[in-house]
């Protein structure tokens, strides 16, 4: 669709520097109506305060703010937890999880208002452009997608600030606000500025969701969490909604410096990037979930669930939520999650979340079998035959290698 044919655009709007500049840019370059859309995924009231007024002052005809907190936690975070997914062994996928629900809601607004185009403010170097546009392609292939960072000639924060100043558009952004941050109920990410140098240690000013582990209380705190069929339902015996459970754990774990990571990751677009992430409540939830899994799943089931988690981490990171593969992976994880019911105690101390107690009505653990003391339920002599069969292929391989005939070796 040519620029002349685009009449109404729905913009994924955050109120930050990029999307503040995109509104007037769209009107100037596409001569179209701009409708702003913002998703409340638990980033905090301060991020949403005055957002509608700001969008309209900047040139939007309307701004829709949609509360997605409960849906985000119930339909995206919890299914992800059941897969056990951790991208490249460290990243708990906080930004990745939020993109499909935001893009889906943006499509729904576009359909509601009769828009013919969708717009996002993602950089042409990042993962989010793929995540947003992959969702658009899956849910609204007929709508045109506009990506200003791949069109305009502005390349820096200073360029954007100058662009807004020329149009007398006020913004709270400044050239000194160097970090790029993205927050939701699960986490907050920090990128940019001196963090782009992997040899530069993050200062205390980088972190906003957790206290420094060095400054955390000198006394550990224990928190008990309860799951039913893979969903957390209680924190310290108090029944809470999925979203409230996460909020509570963010508060408790953040006070003990839990959930910080500083990593270099492989972006989908081919380059490496350095990011600092805070996921306090999520770190506790995932540790507790996996501890309960280890109690209720047998060896083969747990191994397969781990394979699901590895594949799912890339599906989620790469923006492939709305795909048949993702549906299959989540269905597999859900079948295992149905058994994940029970209670876990996690000790929070100086940046660490350590599981110390576990119980489940579905537990496969038997103290009678596991004891190192005397028992009447397990005949240890039975292990000999098992080991002989288990190691048979290794024994045959060794005999072949040494040229020893099988005869009189006990194999024939």
From Swiss-Prot:
InterPro entries: Arginosuc_syn_C, Arginosuc_syn_N, Arginosuc_synth, Arginosuc_synth_CS, Arginosuc_synth_type_1_subfam, AS_cat/multimer_dom_body, Rossmann-like_a/b/a_fold. Its main location: cytoplasm. It is found in: Cytoplasm. This is Argininosuccinate synthase. L-aspartate binds at residues 123, 127-128. Homotetramer. SUPFAM superfamilies: Adenine nucleotide alpha hydrolases-like, Argininosuccinate synthetase, C-terminal domain. HAMAP family: Arg_succ_synth_type1. It comes from the Bacteria. Belongs to the argininosuccinate synthase family. Type 1 subfamily. ATP binds at residues 12-20, 39, 121. One of its GO terms (molecular function) is argininosuccinate synthase activity. Pathway: Amino-acid biosynthesis; L-arginine biosynthesis; L-arginine from L-ornithine and carbamoyl phosphate: step 2/3. It catalyses: L-citrulline + L-aspartate + ATP = 2-(N(omega)-L-arginino)succinate + AMP + diphosphate + H(+). It comes from Pseudoalteromonas atlantica (strain T6c / ATCC BAA-1087). PANTHER family: ARGININOSUCCINATE SYNTHASE (PTHR11587:SF2). One of its GO terms (cellular component) is cytoplasm. Its EC number is 6.3.4.5. GO terms for biological process: argininosuccinate metabolic process; L-arginine biosynthetic process; urea cycle. Gene3D superfamilies: Argininosuccinate synthetase, chain A, domain 2, HUPs, Single helix bin. L-citrulline binds at residues 91, 96, 127, 131, 180, 189, 265, 277. The gene is argG. Keywords: Amino-acid biosynthesis, Arginine biosynthesis, ATP-binding, Cytoplasm, Ligase, Nucleotide-binding.
């Amino acid at each position: 669709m040519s620029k002349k044919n685009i009449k109404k655009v729905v913009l994924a709007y955050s109120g930050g520097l990029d999307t503040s500049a995109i509104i007037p840019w769209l009107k100037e370059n596409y001569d179209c109506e701009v409708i702003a859309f913002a998703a409340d995924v638990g980033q905090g009231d301060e991020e949403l305060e005055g957002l509608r007024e700001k969008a309209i002052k900047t040139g939007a005809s309307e701004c829709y703010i949609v509360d997605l907190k409960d849906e985000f936690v119930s339909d995206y975070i919890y299914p992800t937890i059941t897969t056990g997914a951790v991208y490249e062994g460290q990243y708990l996928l906080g930004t990745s999880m939020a993109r499909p629900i935001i893009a889906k809601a943006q499509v729904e607004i576009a359909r509601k208002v009769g828009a013919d185009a969708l717009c996002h403010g993602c950089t042409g170097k990042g993962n989010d452009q793929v995540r947003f546009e992959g969702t658009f392609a899956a849910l609204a292939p007929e709508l045109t997608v506009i990506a200003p960072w791949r069109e305009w000639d502005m390349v820096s924060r200073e360029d954007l600030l100058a662009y807004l100043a020329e149009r007398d558009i006020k913004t709270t952004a400044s050239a000194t606000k160097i970090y790029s941050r993205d927050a939701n109920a699960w986490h907050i990410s920090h990128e940019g500025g001196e963090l782009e140098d992997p040899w530069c240690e993050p200062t205390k000013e980088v972190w906003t969701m957790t206290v420094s582990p060095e400054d955390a209380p000198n006394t550990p705190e224990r928190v008990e969490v309860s799951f039913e069929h893979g969903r957390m339902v209680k924190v310290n015996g108090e029944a809470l909604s999925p979203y409230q459970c996460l909020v509570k754990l963010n508060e408790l774990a953040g006070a003990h410096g839990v959930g910080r990571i500083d990593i270099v990751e492989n972006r989908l677009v081919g380059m490496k990037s350095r990011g600092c992430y805070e996921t306090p409540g999520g770190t506790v939830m995932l540790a507790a979930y996996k501890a309960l899994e280890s109690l209720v799943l047998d060896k083969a089931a747990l191994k397969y669930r781990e394979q699901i988690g590895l594949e799912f981490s890339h599906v989620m990171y790469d923006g492939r939520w709305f795909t048949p593969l993702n549906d299959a992976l989540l269905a597999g994880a859900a079948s295992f999650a149905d058994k994940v019911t029970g209670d876990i105690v996690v000790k929070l101390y100086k940046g660490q979340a350590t599981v110390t107690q576990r119980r489940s009505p579905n537990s496969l653990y038997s103290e009678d079998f596991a004891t190192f003391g005397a028992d009447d339920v397990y005949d240890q002599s039975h292990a000999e035959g098992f080991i002989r069969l288990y190691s048979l292929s290794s024994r045959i391989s060794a005999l072949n290698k040494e040229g020893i005939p099988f005869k009189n070796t006990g194999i024939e």
